[in-house]
């Protein structure tokens, strides 16, 4: 890529995505539907079929729309 193209388009973009657990290891549910403190953990399937759990901790979901935009969703 020559310098004129880099001025027009900018440098190539690099994406880095790190995945963190939804809760620390000691807070993960030992039984299905419940966490260690007796609270309920909601389970659902993501778009690609992956399991997502919702507990007292926050996780960030990154979704790409059909228009190529990235959406950050706090769940």
UniProtKB/Swiss-Prot annotation:
Basic and acidic residues bias (residue ranges): 32-43
Domain of life: Eukaryota
GO cellular component, one term: nucleus
Localization in the cell: Nucleus
Keyword Nucleus (UniProt): yes
Major location category of this protein: nucleus
Alphabetically ordered keywords of this record: ERV, Nucleus, Transposable element
Region spans: Disordered: 24-43
Additional note from the record: Protein expressed at very low level.
Biological role: May possess a function in tumorigenesis.
Protein name in the entry: Endogenous retrovirus group K member 7 Np9 protein
Annotated source species: Homo sapiens (Human)
Gene: ERVK-7
